[in-house]
């Protein structure tokens, strides 16, 4: 870093804004350092149109999808990136698996190892600090647990969304529920987005509205029932 004494923004309970000496050469540096924003004084009056353009780019949220690659783009990381773009976010993608399928047929999965997933993330994190991460298809709950630990260590305030892909749309079941690991995973998530079948797979007979409300309160978890 070019900062002589850079504070740790993640260790602060309130957003930190960089002030003083802000120019086009230092805006990206401030963002990479983890500052919530920058305050420009003299520079913005010298080139207002250029300053506005840079501000818009600075405030565009980065959203990361860690998901499988579906060649038909009906689901997985490519579908997520298309969705992110429609919201005005800048989508980043990490491949957790390659699936061999189209809309009606599934023939297999090649899993990306946890080390390969983290290697993809490490390079992205050198340049981008995502505000949200959406996790889709992963090999099992153990890999999911490891991945969440890794992400929280990198960005303690990161909001993690889990789309529990337990079965492919073509019918293949990827993995079964593990209650003990699920109890460790849920408290660290911001949101889960299961459909009805996935709700029953995750919570069994507890998948009814009042029970789900209790689960959400217990784990401080948001549940979007699709």
Annotated model-derived regions:
Residues 1-5, 27-58, 92-100:
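Glycine-rich phosphate-binding active-site loops on the catalytic face of alpha/beta enzymes
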Residues 10-19, 61, 157-160:
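Short beta-strand/loop segments at the ligand-binding rim of alpha/beta enzyme cores
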Residues 14-25, 76:
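Glycine-rich beta-to-alpha transition loops that act as phosphate-gripper elements at the mouths
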Residues 16-20, 38-40, 91-93, 160-162, ...:
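Hydrophobic faces of well-ordered beta-strands that scaffold small-molecule active sites
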Residues 32-34, 87, 218:
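Structural motif
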Residues 60-65, 81-169:
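Conserved N-terminal subdomain of the carbohydrate kinase-like
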Residues 66-74:
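Short, glycine-rich nucleotide/cofactor-binding loops
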Residues 173-226:
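Conserved phosphate/ATP/ADP-binding segment of small-molecule kinases
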């Amino acid at each position: 870093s070019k900062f002589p004494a850079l504070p740790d923004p993640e260790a602060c309970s309130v957003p930190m804004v960089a002030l003083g000496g802000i120019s086009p050469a230092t805006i990206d540096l401030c963002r990479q350092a983890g500052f919530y924003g920058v305050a420009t004084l003299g520079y913005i009056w010298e080139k207002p149109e250029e300053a506005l353009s840079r501000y818009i780019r600075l405030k565009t949220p980065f959203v990361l999808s860690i998901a499988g690659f579906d060649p038909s783009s009906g689901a997985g990381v490519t579908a997520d990136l298309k969705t992110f773009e429609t919201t005005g976010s800048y989508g980043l993608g990490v491949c957790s698996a390659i699936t061999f399928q189209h809309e009606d047929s599934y023939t297999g999965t090649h899993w990306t190892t946890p080390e390969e997933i983290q290697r993809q993330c490490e390079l992205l994190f050198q340049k981008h600090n995502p505000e949200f991460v959406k996790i889709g298809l992963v090999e099992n709950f153990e890999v999911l647990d490891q991945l969440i630990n890794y992400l929280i260590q990198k960005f303690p305030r990161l909001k993690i969304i889990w789309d529990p892909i337990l079965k492919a749309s073509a019918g293949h079941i990827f993995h079964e529920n593990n209650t003990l690991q699920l109890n460790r995973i849920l408290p660290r998530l911001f949101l889960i987005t299961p459909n009805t079948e996935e709700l029953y797979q995750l919570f069994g007979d507890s998948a009814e509205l009042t029970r789900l409300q209790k689960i959400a309160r217990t784990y401080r978890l948001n549940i979007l029932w699709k």
